[in-house]
């Protein structure tokens, strides 16, 4: 899992939620992991393009619907390939895993730009059984 990592991408918050909270907990965790591993954190690759409801009280189907299409890759992600860059391994990081809806939506957005030859690993700090 930890070999050949090119970047760690934290699951982004919508800018209004991050502004209100003052930080993104996934980014805080990602920065600590990145420092330990000596790899960059890229907050410029994946964006939350619309606000979503908090997922805490939603059931599995509602969670999937809530985040469907909420994430997109940025122009910076597309530029990596246009400029001849190579990426072998991305770590997508979130603070907690419950149903996988958020991470799945992020994965699909990343896969729309990064080909199957790029490994995308998912890491979370915690798991909540529902």
Identify the function of each model-found stretch.
Residues 1-91, 99-130:
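Conserved PRPP/pyrophosphate-binding segment of the phosphoribosyltransferase/PRPP-pathway fold
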């Amino acid at each position: 899992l930890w070999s050949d990592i090119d970047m760690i991408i934290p699951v982004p918050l919508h800018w209004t939620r991050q502004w209100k909270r003052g930080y993104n907990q996934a980014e805080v965790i990602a920065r600590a992991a990145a420092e330990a591993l000596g790899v960059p954190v890229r907050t410029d690759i994946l964006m939350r393009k619309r606000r979503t409801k908090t997922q805490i009280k939603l059931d599995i189907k509602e969670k999937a619907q809530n985040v469907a299409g909420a994430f997109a890759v940025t122009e910076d992600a597309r530029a990596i390939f246009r400029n001849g860059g190579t990426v072998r391994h991305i770590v997508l990081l979130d603070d907690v895993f419950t149903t996988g809806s958020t991470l799945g939506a992020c994965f699909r957005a990343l896969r729309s730009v990064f080909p199957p030859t790029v490994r995308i690993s998912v890491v979370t700090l915690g798991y909540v059984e529902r």
